[in-house]
Amino acid sequence: TFSEQGVRWPFPWDMHAKFTRFVSSGNPQSIFFDVMFLDHKEHEKEFAEAIHDSGNVFLDFPFETEEVHVKYSDIDERMEILNQYRFPVDPDDTKMPWVEEAVPPTPMLARAAEGIGYANIKPDVTDKVNRQLPLIIKYRGFYYPSIDLVIVMHYYGITQDDVEIQIGKYVKLKNIPPEKMAKPSSDRTITIPIDDEGFMDINFIGGPGSFQSYSYYYFAREGKYKHKSLENKICLVAAYSSTGISTDIHPSPYGQLFGIEHHANALNTILNQDFIIKLTPLQNVLIMLVLALLMGILLPRFSIVFSVIFAVVLGLLYVIGSYILFDTMNFICAFTTPIIQIGGTFSFILAYRVLTEQQEKKYIRQTFSKFVSKSVVDELLKDPKMLQLGGQKKILTVLFSDIRSFTSLSETMPPEELVEHLNEY
């Protein structure tokens, strides 16, 4: 429809102004533009007025990981506005920042907005999959909040004084109205777990299209939005298309997702208090120790075939148990290492059993072949427990053979020759 009118991405700012006015008439809780408004453009004043009149528009910006070659003449003014949102650094935080430079929105738009925050996403360095979101970023001796945290603070109606940050542990939101909490508590706080770089784990609810989306074109009009579908909702606006206009796409545990979907999942995680709880390294080590002890005690008592079955079943039970813990309680256990440990422990015990059984059979063969026939030795090798002292009651047929003149014969032969002679019988 836009293409029919000759409108191409990025859309002109007067269209964003029209969109903002129309959506605001539907009384949404927040409007978040995941669109970078970094350069001054035509209709900036009109767009700023629409943002200001709405009173609930949030804009994002990038924290660059390298030095920015494009210099903005008003960067000091931009940073002055951005600094209104910063938090003091935790005294125990000694880590170096991983960002180089901030590029906030234009001052006119930033002042008109209800809040601004960065929109950075940083995939895992090992497999390039994004499972986390930097809730706070350390920059020039302060913590700066992500756009998601800024929106959440607005949703709960709290200020910077109601936020407590302890790096490597949590971001705590305090004095929250109970009626706005998904899981109300007496202390009226929400504790968001973070790592030592300020990253929170995103509890993704699914793959592409998990959140309801609408065409921008429908809302970019004059007039009033008369339906209730936007009322008290957080509306996220971004280039969200399979036609190639959006390059903001990142891998997730559920496949490729647009950047705005990562933010939607992060907001959903916080607002529903569905935080992922990772077991500590010590807890994971204890789990692996229990698995190793269980296998060490039971496997030597089983046959090799039953040992294989037991190891496979134990591995499957661990996988199923880990899934149930995550699905019901949001607990994440170490996954790959315990499975490898089960296989490694089984292989070690199996190798040990094979070696010891071979040594035992070799000892039995060498010892008893001097005294009994080969067939008797073979029977002993089938079941070495037959060597133990004690009687057994069995119905047997016995053949007695008497060697004539054995006494006089034995007196004339050395022991070695006598045994060899007896073995012929």
PLM segments and residue spans:
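Generic alpha-helical secondary structure signal
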Residues: 258, 262-266, 289, 375, ...
